Amino acid sequence: PPIAENVIAYKTFLLDYIRKYPQDMVIPLFNDTAEFASKFKQEIEQYGCKVEIPDWEVFIKGHDKESLMEICKFLGVPHPRTANPDKMGYEEAINYVGYPCLIKPNLSAGAKGIKIIRNKADFDNYFQDITSHFGKSTIQEFIPQTGKQLKVQIYRAENGQVVASSCYEKCRYYPIDGGTRS
């Protein structure tokens, strides 16, 4: 069953499958399955199947965009200015981030829910709608795509050794307007 439609049915199917057909390892390939595998890692591993994903407490710190930006700020890692209008109020948030900026759901993938806003009217038109569909969201400094956009993937063993890696240039910036609603 599709995970997006019924997490419980997906979990039941996966655990039954692993019980009937033992597997050495599960490697989630998409955001929804990565989130699922991290949340239910201990249950899956009870069947002797290693789950190649961090435990939930570690995973969510990097998966939640607001949390990740807070960690970057704390560590002094360059990152787009990010603020939560629900926590600090619109005026303080926009004074920190500035226009144009993006509304970004904390938990989403594939640019879903991301919308570029250029003024207060845009904010008023989109912020509540996006948070009602996608949950907690932030506003983030818009950084125009002026050069190459590279994607780097690194797979490491538990001891930190790089097992595999890849780097490629994205052919286009998607979506052009900063995001999709669905």
Predicted regions and their residues:
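Short beta-strand-to-turn element immediately C-terminal to the catalytic PLP-Schiff-base lysine
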Residues: P85, I114-N119, I154-A157
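Glycine-rich phosphate-binding loop signature in dinucleotide/nucleotide-binding domains
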Residues: Y17-Q23, Y96-V97, S132-H133
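Conserved N-proximal alpha/beta basic substrate-recognition cap immediately N-terminal to
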Residues: P2-R81
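ATP-dependent carboxylate/phosphate-activation module, predominantly the ATP-grasp catalytic core
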Residues: A121, E141-S182
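Mobile, glycine- and charge-enriched loop segments
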Residues: P1-A4, N84-P85, Y126
